[in-house]
Amino acid sequence: MASEAVKVVVRCRPMNQRERELRCQPVVTVDCARAQCCIQNPGAADEPPKQFTFDGAYHVDHVTEQIYNEIAYPLVEGVTEGYNGTIFAYGQTGSGKSFTMQGLPDPPSQRGIIPRAFEHVFESVQCAENTKFLVRASYLEIYNEDVRDLLGADTKQKLELKEHPEKGVYVKGLSMHTVHSVAQCEHIMETGWKNRSVGYTLMNKDSSRSHSIFTISIEMSAVDERGKDHLRAGKLNLVDLAGSERQSKTGATGERLKEATKINLSLSALGNVISALVDGRCKHVPYRDSKLTRLLQDSLGGNTKTLMVACLSPADNNYDETLSTLRYANRAKNIRNKPRINEDPKDALLREYQEEIKKLKAILTQQMSPSSLSALLSRQVPPDPVQVEEKLLPQPVIQHDVEAEKQLIREEYEERLARLKADYKAEQESRARLEEDITAMRNSYDVRLSTLEENLRKETEAVLQVGVLYKAEVMSRAEFASSAEYPPAFQYETVVKPKVFSTTDTLPSDDVSKTQVSSRFAELPKVEPSKSEISLGSSESSSLEETSVSEAFPGPEEPSNVEVSMPTEESRSRYFLDECLGQEAAGHLLGEQNYLPQEEPQEVPLQGLLGLQDPFAEVEAKLARLSSTVARTDAPQADVPKVPVQVPAPTDLLEPSDARPEAEAADDFPPRPEVDLASEVALEVVRTAEPGVWLEAQAPVALVAQPEPLPATAGVKRESVGMEVAVLTDDPLPVVDQQQVLARLQLLEQQVVGGEQAKNKDLKEKHKRRKRYADERRKQLVAALQNSDEDSGDWVLLNVYDSIQEEVRAKSKLLEKMQRKLRAAEVEIKDLQSEFQLEKIDYLATIRRQERDSMLLQQLLEQVQPLIRRDCNYSNLEKILRESCWDEDNGFWKIPHPVITKTSLPVAVSTGPQNKPARKTSAADNGEPNMEDDRYRLMLSRSNSENIASNYFRSKRASQILSTDARKSLTHHNSPPGLSCPLSNNSAIPPTQAPEMPQPRPFRLESLDIPFTKAKRKKSKSNFGSEPL
């Protein structure tokens, strides 16, 4: 992996009003062509100036625009390509760090690096082709080693630093705001700048008291030539550091002094990190010494392109700070980073947005066509940037009114929660009512359908006569067919024209013309009725074509041809072919791709049919009345492609007027509900009219067409011959709120930007021109440095001198130049040694001070340790030291908590009552022993051991009472053997006497021997002989 050094530039500001009042002299000189900076020691004018070379050097007359175009532009351009970048300003307080990073809005040339980075990022985003970007911004500060979110609801809340194996170090709970334009980024920057901690010092009236980091996170999705997405992510950190301070110059006291101490500690940790990275022998880099160095861990020696802007003060009053800044910057040049493109990050939010957009578009595409969806999305007006900013950014929190703001947020949350609950409850109630209405409609539909079927069974009894006559004529056909010389008495010619019940997904079908009904019918006298047209009952169901029925009846004596033109519709399954035509006819039809062959019409005997009444007219009229009710019970669904099947029906043998109401009713109804009703009606007709055919069709029905279970809104539709049957098998679409889905889709698409100015040639040319300028400036700097090296090289040796004197003069000039360099090197070594000596003295003083503090703490510990209770765990300090451990993240020791172990000694004599020892151990348990009680017990124990007479003449009863006390019995055991004899005899008391012992009296009453002298004497006389001397 290729590595690159940290780029370092220096910028020297003009003198401010304070320095001019102090009549300070400039000590810094800058050579912009060679990127060199020199500083002269004001205390040693004879010494040569110290010279430093960087990647860029800018003096007082240079503006921020030039700095950005020459140095910062390539780094920010790399961020839009997937690299990580960091730009941070370093220097003492009042040196112009915030001016370099933030800048001034007027004049435009002095705008800071941060707002220029905004313009650059969105310029690259808008010019990109086939790439979408998700740009987010965050703003934080480090104040007194506490991380705060400058864009959060509570800017004073402390945030924690976490570390992830893939993301690295990050701030937990930091708010990220999606931005779409430069205006939104500037608004975020201004909001965070107002919340930043600033203070007044003698060197700067608006001194930054914290380090701030503005982060721009970019996620990009590029589409290659193959149409595959490539996801990359880049991050740009714009760091404005607080300046190092000297208390003698800033006059910081109190809170300002505490802030200055924290600032100097963090900057010192940053310097240590830089020194450790430059020194190749150092194995440990102290990133954890400060939160600033932890957040910049990836920027210093990691996967980041880094630019350091060292800000200088030209005044001689700040010579030491300026020299220290130059040394730090010169050291940072040698840091090597290893930047790489962040490809396919696992936690990319842009990938989640793209997947959600695809899902939402799929949902909307099911409800509307893609063209209408794209038109609807294109008509949407993007929201006003100001309104978007107000939604993205919280309002600044007023410090003195935090509680009121919290209360307002709480009330708003409760109001939203109540509104959501009310909406949910109303939706549930509406759903319940809708289910009740659907159930009622279905019940009404079932009742009416059952009533209609019952009426049809009664009305179709007349059709039985038609079936009987039809069978009789079929059986007599053989007799008439054998005699060819007999002319037909009646000829019936049927012309069947196919009709298609069209839906949105209906497949195209071929036209089928005249169909032969049967080849076995005999010729009959021709009857020609009057012509009529089948009119459509509804303009909406215009899929059935109008057909004309032409029938000629010249007279009862002369036969004529009867042509009937009626619609025959598609059938949905073979089930109905077998059901209506029989097994043989259905098999014949299915074998020829479900179409009947075109043949000449045959003459059909139709004697006796002209006088029959039409039983279908009344039925179809009732079906038409139910159309509106049935249409509400079924939800609309998309139709599937259907294959039309043309079949003849027994109703073709009826009068032409008999078929008209059926066609009209089928055309009037919506596609699904009427087919449900009409199929049931026609099936009952076929069952009744043709019992023989129906019985023959039962076997093939079970084998050919087994209906599959479908949802309640779609089922197998059975229809009579001559009508089209459609089977709906599509699943119902998910019920979604189209407006909510559309609003979410628009919101997600607005989050993603990119390619808005892809066709703008002027903007692209400007973008390329600025990139070329940065490359040319870098080449010029490299050439200037090479020329500088040649000046100090051996080019002089190539000259040819005309005389010895000319050569001596040239050699003298070269020697003077080398002597100046030698003198500068000696001064530099002396300065480094002096700095090292000062640091060594400082380190030794710190070590001595820490040793004195350690000795003080050790002496205090030796004095305090004997006072610690023995039942406390801190009485054993060695164990506490073994259990303690250092917390690297928080920077303090984790020590055990103090614990007091409550212990009580067991009772020595088990025959006495337990209430008295419990009372005595309670004081010890509480940790507060009664010192007066202890002294009184000690006095009693001494009197017992010294007063021989009292011990000798002591009664048994008193000794029994005293023996119940464990501590008193222990004191008697410690007495001399001769004096403990009276008490030792009490231990020989039989166990039977133990329950008869009296209750013990209070301890203090034992010393009063006056009331019990007589009793003691009597008992002593009785036991005098038994007691040993």
Curated annotation (Swiss-Prot):
<dbReference type="GO" id="GO:0005815">
    <property type="term" value="C:microtubule organizing center"/>
</dbReference>
<dbReference type="GO" id="GO:0036064">
    <property type="term" value="C:ciliary basal body"/>
</dbReference>
<dbReference type="GO" id="GO:0032839">
    <property type="term" value="C:dendrite cytoplasm"/>
</dbReference>
<dbReference type="GO" id="GO:0032391">
    <property type="term" value="C:photoreceptor connecting cilium"/>
</dbReference>
<dbReference type="InterPro" id="IPR001752">
    <property type="entry name" value="Kinesin_motor_dom"/>
</dbReference>
<dbReference type="GO" id="GO:0005737">
    <property type="term" value="C:cytoplasm"/>
</dbReference>
<dbReference type="GO" id="GO:0005929">
    <property type="term" value="C:cilium"/>
</dbReference>
<dbReference type="GO" id="GO:0016887">
    <property type="term" value="F:ATP hydrolysis activity"/>
</dbReference>
<dbReference type="InterPro" id="IPR027417">
    <property type="entry name" value="P-loop_NTPase"/>
</dbReference>
<feature type="region of interest" description="Disordered">
    <location>
        <begin position="523"/>
        <end position="569"/>
    </location>
</feature>
<dbReference type="GO" id="GO:0043005">
    <property type="term" value="C:neuron projection"/>
</dbReference>
<feature type="region of interest" description="Disordered">
    <location>
        <begin position="647"/>
        <end position="673"/>
    </location>
</feature>
<keyword id="KW-0206">Cytoskeleton</keyword>
<dbReference type="GO" id="GO:0098971">
    <property type="term" value="P:anterograde dendritic transport of neurotransmitter receptor complex"/>
</dbReference>
<dbReference type="GO" id="GO:0015031">
    <property type="term" value="P:protein transport"/>
</dbReference>
<feature type="region of interest" description="Disordered">
    <location>
        <begin position="968"/>
        <end position="1029"/>
    </location>
</feature>
<dbReference type="GO" id="GO:0016192">
    <property type="term" value="P:vesicle-mediated transport"/>
</dbReference>
<keyword id="KW-0493">Microtubule</keyword>
<feature type="binding site">
    <location>
        <begin position="91"/>
        <end position="98"/>
    </location>
    <ligand>
        <name>ATP</name>
    </ligand>
</feature>
<dbReference type="InterPro" id="IPR036961">
    <property type="entry name" value="Kinesin_motor_dom_sf"/>
</dbReference>
<keyword id="KW-0963">Cytoplasm</keyword>
<feature type="compositionally biased region" description="Basic and acidic residues">
    <location>
        <begin position="657"/>
        <end position="673"/>
    </location>
</feature>
<keyword id="KW-0966">Cell projection</keyword>
<dbReference type="GO" id="GO:0030030">
    <property type="term" value="P:cell projection organization"/>
</dbReference>
<feature type="coiled-coil region">
    <location>
        <begin position="346"/>
        <end position="462"/>
    </location>
</feature>
<comment type="function">
    <text>Dendrite-specific motor protein which, in association with the Apba1-containing complex (LIN-10-LIN-2-LIN-7 complex), transports vesicles containing N-methyl-D-aspartate (NMDA) receptor subunit NR2B along microtubules.</text>
</comment>
<dbReference type="GO" id="GO:0098794">
    <property type="term" value="C:postsynapse"/>
</dbReference>
<dbReference type="Pfam" id="PF00225">
    <property type="entry name" value="Kinesin"/>
</dbReference>
<keyword id="KW-0175">Coiled coil</keyword>
<dbReference type="GO" id="GO:0005874">
    <property type="term" value="C:microtubule"/>
</dbReference>
<dbReference type="GO" id="GO:0005930">
    <property type="term" value="C:axoneme"/>
</dbReference>
<feature type="coiled-coil region">
    <location>
        <begin position="739"/>
        <end position="846"/>
    </location>
</feature>
<protein>
    <recommendedName>
        <fullName>Kinesin-like protein KIF17</fullName>
    </recommendedName>
</protein>
<dbReference type="GO" id="GO:0008017">
    <property type="term" value="F:microtubule binding"/>
</dbReference>
<dbReference type="GO" id="GO:0001750">
    <property type="term" value="C:photoreceptor outer segment"/>
</dbReference>
<dbReference type="GO" id="GO:0001917">
    <property type="term" value="C:photoreceptor inner segment"/>
</dbReference>
<dbReference type="GO" id="GO:1990075">
    <property type="term" value="C:periciliary membrane compartment"/>
</dbReference>
<dbReference type="GO" id="GO:0005829">
    <property type="term" value="C:cytosol"/>
</dbReference>
<comment type="similarity">
    <text>Belongs to the TRAFAC class myosin-kinesin ATPase superfamily. Kinesin family.</text>
</comment>
<keyword id="KW-0813">Transport</keyword>
<feature type="domain" description="Kinesin motor">
    <location>
        <begin position="5"/>
        <end position="335"/>
    </location>
</feature>
<keyword id="KW-0653">Protein transport</keyword>
